[in-house]
Amino acid sequence: MPSQRKSPDQKRPRRSLSTSKTAKSQCHSITSYFNSAPPAKLACSTCHKMVPRYDLIRHLDESCANNGVGDDVQVEPAQAGLMSPTVPTSDLPSGPLENVTPQKLSPPKRSLISVQCGSKLGIQQQTSPYFKDALVSKDQNELPNQSVEIMPLGSLTSKLSRRYLNAKKSLAKNEGLASQCPQTSPSTPGTSLTDNCPEMEDKDEVLNSSQKENIYSCAPLKEENASEQKVKNNKITGDESQKASCGEPALTPASAEHASILLSSDSTLVSNTKSSPGDTLVKQESARRADVGLAEPLEVRSHKEVQMTFDAAAKTLVSGEAESNGPTDVDMSDMTTWSNNQELVREAGSVLHCPLEQGSSCGGPSETAQLALSHPYYLRSFLVVLQALLGNEEDMKLFDEQEKAIITRFYQLSASGQKLYVRLFQRKLTWIKMSKLEYEEIASDLTPVVEELKDSGFLQTESELQELSDVLELLSAPELKALAKTFHLVSPGGQKQQLVDAFHKLAKQRSVCTWGKTQPGIRAVILKRAKDLAGRSLRVCKGPRAVFARILLLFSLTDSMEDEEAACGGQGQLSTVLLVNLGRMEFPQYTICRKTQIFRDREDLIRYAAAAHMLSDISAAMASGNWEDAKELARSAKRDWEQLKSHPSLRYHEALPPFLRCFTVGWIYTRISSRAVEVLERLHMYEEAVKELENLLSQKIYCPDSRGRWWDRLALNLHQHLKRLEEAIRCIREGLADPHVRTGHRLSLYQRAVRLRESPSCRKYKHLFSRLPEVAVGDVKHVTITGRLCPQHGMGKSVFVMESGDGANPTTVLCSVEELALGYYRQSGFDQGIHGEGSTFSTLCGLLLWDIIFMDGIPDVFRNAYQASPLDLLTDSFFASREQALEARLQLIHSAPAESLRAWVGEAWQAQQGRVASLVSWDRFTSLQQAQDLVSCLGGPVLSGVCRRLAADFRHCRGGLPDLVVWNSQSHHCKLVEVKGPSDRLSCKQMIWLYELQKLGADVEVCHVVAVGAKSKGLG
């Protein structure tokens, strides 16, 4: 276009906008309205300089003399009046906003702060520098001198949205507590910081009505009884009933208010689940100091229990609350209370300290706060992980001095060096061309940063690239083709892998000129020319990378229980920290109690990390269909495991509870062997698969929850593939006698035994079926409907054609078999329906049992600040450790009327909405009203029965629940439906759940969908 080819100075002037008679008489086409060229330069709204139109944003971010005013808004205490004793408390909003639902994705609103707080609290309104009228000046010399903060270009709106939060943190931490609380001194241990800051609580409630626990708040502690209750709720005082919280006797829900509810028949099930501002203050400070390294190193006592020791500031903080109960000693030997919300890691970057020598990029506390705020999200997350390790003495013992020196060198890197290393660390461990590195937010020229990382031992450059396979992988396909032409390779136009194979074949050939011993070989010539073609390249050094990978593995240890990919070193945990940092993820509030040491020494952790990486490689090979590679990896892992079976550390692992034993090397190698069975079956190597299964079943220490699947696969291989009928029958008998064989696998073994017993070929083995335990499952109601099947090619779920809309405007839509069934039941009078399978019931169970799931007093089930469930949720110890509380709650649910069920679900929903929990899917229901309608239709007996089965054996019972839940909102009639499409049948777990639900009194049925042709709709 002409506007693009001409410079702004050469463009024609703006057309006249005059509405004179002459102009009106002219008739123009519509294109004339788009020919007015914009001005070449615009006046900056801040400094009033004439700036090129295309450089206005860059000028505002980098060059404008007054942009510091908008970036870093300094609110003086005298101006704000937040903590001034002259401000009357009657003008402040009073009362906690307890009924406000926390919003997971809602950041603090600037308009709310400006309107509500500016008038009452005297806070200067935070206005973007682009719209500050106070800065308008016609004389450039009149502009005040402002400090200019150089910020990397990025999302401008994201920078603006964080400015008020950063200014507020700076006020609260650096100015507010020091200037407005002068009475507090180390000589007065009975006075806390909160006694002199009564206004902060009301200020906090106004600023963060929906997530008030996320901001540092100071609640007044004038009433002795109130402060005592708050301290007891947070387990801070030395109360005798709470000192054994990590021992066996004390079992309390996460809130003290729940303790009296468990054994009472009161209609209030979950009362005041959200912590008060005073509670949150102590919880949040505990978590912040533990998570980012402000606390002193953790001490491991003789009973191997982790103790959190607060620094002087923290002791002053809790001294006023502890005074009401007696002496000022605060017993934190049993547990440390963590408030897991998104603000903790968000504030972590501003309080990170570098406990290292001079020369580090983090100079001191004041410099650290300013520097960390400028760090990008990925570096802040990485530093949070490092500080969590440095603050835990038990974890620090798992690294030797050389590895600690690597951490020290990382802190000594410049800010750009740290950023680049974290970026490269998160990428795949392979060689990277320097020309492919583009991180403008780090530096426009990365060469000095790369040299710094190389000198510090974190990077390798092309001088150390000596493997031909690595350099060939580094080249692109066109570069490989060009290189192939120079060596006259046949078919240089092939695929990249074919060219790589051709080069490897050429490199193995012997040189024709055998008399020249000093002449380089063919491999060396290929390597040199390939490196010249690739140019400068680099790779992260394996040694330091392995150290940081182990740190991440320790930090994300609890995630690897279900997430197969978490075995790759905890890379995904950085994403979790990032989401928490951005306020997009919030975890429940629970108490961390680390009593048992999992890894005895450094070598134990290294062995576990090696096994975890092997499991990750095997899983990746299986996912890509490389079964031969997976088989070789599994055989290599088996050899390593055979050498470790006599190691003395295994005896220590055997004594661990199952929910901690899963973090041992033996457990990982057992999972690898279980994967090897699937690989061998895929390759039709059934003899080897049977031997592997027999080895797995010969031990009962590792992976006991998988024994049902192992017995089932062994019986299938012996019966179907190897035709060893007698061995198959004996296998079934032993499997049915195994107490670890549960639910679906138990029924599957029994059904196979029945088929074998009725088979004519097994008549001579009838004596083996004597005393076979019977597994009885009753049948339920079945209905059949028809649906027009949409023609499709390939495998996959069936797609049906369904009529939608009213009679006047009918439409044809494509739907799944479950959606087709929902339409059928909608026509049958059920106006509400959900296709959620097990998530529907687990969400209701999680809401009704929330405080018991996250209750205090059970050691080692919560070990870090990023857990969505206790570690023992998938084991039998979950119900056993909480039996008294669960039995009382289940009886309460069983006899509760519909109004109480609705109220309990509503209270838990409003108090916990958005927090990440394994059982709860917040998007399963369209609203709280829909969830309340469903619980009132299901009733107490059905809900208590479902909750009991899920709590007793969540691992084996979470699957198999009905697909649909439909109900009539007027008659409160509810139906649970399992939908089966063409050529689909019920699984064993589904049969058991339907039978159990029917026994509980629920209306259940199986809806079979029979397909008919769709040619009448013209879709053939």
UniProtKB/Swiss-Prot annotation:
Q: How is the cofactor bound?
A: Binds 2 magnesium or manganese ions per subunit.
Q: What is this protein called?
A: Fanconi-associated nuclease 1
InterPro entries recorded: Fan1-like, FAN1-like_euk, FAN1-like_TPR, FAN1-like_WH, Fan1_SAP_met, Rad18_UBZ4, tRNA_endonuc-like_dom_sf, VRR_NUC
Taxonomic classification: Eukaryota, Metazoa, Chordata, Craniata, Vertebrata
Biased amino acid composition, Polar residues: 180-195, 269-278
User: Could you give the domain comment from the record?
Assistant: The UBZ4-type zinc finger specifically binds monoubiquitinated FANCD2. The KEN box and D-box are required for interaction with FZR1/CDH1 and essential for APC(CDH1)-mediated ubiquitination.
- Major site of localization recorded for this protein: nucleus
Please describe the post-translational modifications of this protein.
Ubiquitinated and degraded during mitotic exit by the APC/C-Cdh1 complex.
Name a GO CC annotation attached to this entry: intercellular bridge
Q: Partners and quaternary state? A: Interacts with FANCD2 (when monoubiquitinated). Interacts with FANCI, MLH1, MLH3 and PMS2.
Q: Where does Mn(2+) 2 bind?
A: E837, D963
Q: Which cofactor does it need?
A: Mn(2+); Mg(2+)
Task: Please name the source species.
Answer: Mus musculus
UBZ4-type Zn finger ranges? 41-69
Q: Which GO terms describe its molecular function?
A: 5'-3' exonuclease activity; 5'-flap endonuclease activity; flap-structured DNA binding; phosphodiesterase I activity; ubiquitin-modified protein reader activity; zinc ion binding
